[in-house]
């Protein structure tokens, strides 16, 4: 059975949103930068997290392409229309198998996407993190992104 891995909340002012969540009593991690141009701050829970994310206007963001879901372009385009919950990530034991299943079910035909980066834990210590993502789309909810996240 899957569980919610994390919720992606798109915001124009990343530090302002982080400040709000901190004032609400959450521990908000430091700013991270993805190689595809987005920046985030994480609010970690035991088995899930909230990802506050933004797409700086000067970011070099790869475009969508056949078979390729551009995470950065999705966030940028979402923020041109609104702020809020932009994506729902479900847990995965095998993102490659998820991508195959999504294609068979007609809800995604995207190559899995893998990336690694250095992150910081809430206590400030450095950690290495790696993710494999499989993306799906819902034509009934085109402004909401769905993906599975294998960590």
Where are these regions (language model features)?
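Short, extreme N-terminal leader segments that mark the start of a protein/domain
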Residues: 1-30
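Short, solvent-exposed coil/turn segments
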Residues: 2-4, 36-38, 142
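Vicinal oxygen chelate
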Residues: 3-12, 41-46, 49-51, 63-151
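Generic structural motif
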Residues: 12-14, 48, 55-57, 93-95, ...
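Residue-identity detector for glycine
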Residues: 16, 25, 29, 37, ...
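Glycine/small-residue-rich interface belts in oligomeric ring/scaffold proteins
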Residues: 19-77
């Amino acid at each position: 059975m899957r569980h919610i891995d994390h919720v992606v909340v798109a915001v124009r002012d990343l530090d302002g949103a982080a400040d709000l969540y901190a004032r609400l009593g959450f521990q908000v991690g430091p700013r991270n930068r993805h190689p595809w141009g987005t920046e985030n701050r994480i609010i970690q829970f035991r088995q899930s997290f909230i990802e506050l994310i933004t797409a700086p206007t000067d970011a070099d963001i790869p475009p969508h392409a056949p078979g390729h879901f551009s995470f950065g372009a999705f966030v940028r385009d979402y923020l041109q229309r609104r702020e809020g919950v932009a994506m729902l990530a479900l847990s995965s034991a095998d993102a490659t198998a998820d991508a195959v299943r999504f294609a068979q079910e007609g809800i995604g035909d995207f190559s899995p996407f893998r990336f690694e980066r250095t992150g910081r834990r809430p206590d400030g210590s450095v950690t290495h993190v790696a993710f494999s993502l499989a993306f799906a789309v819902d034509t009934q909810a085109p402004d909401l992104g769905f993906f599975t996240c294998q960590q």
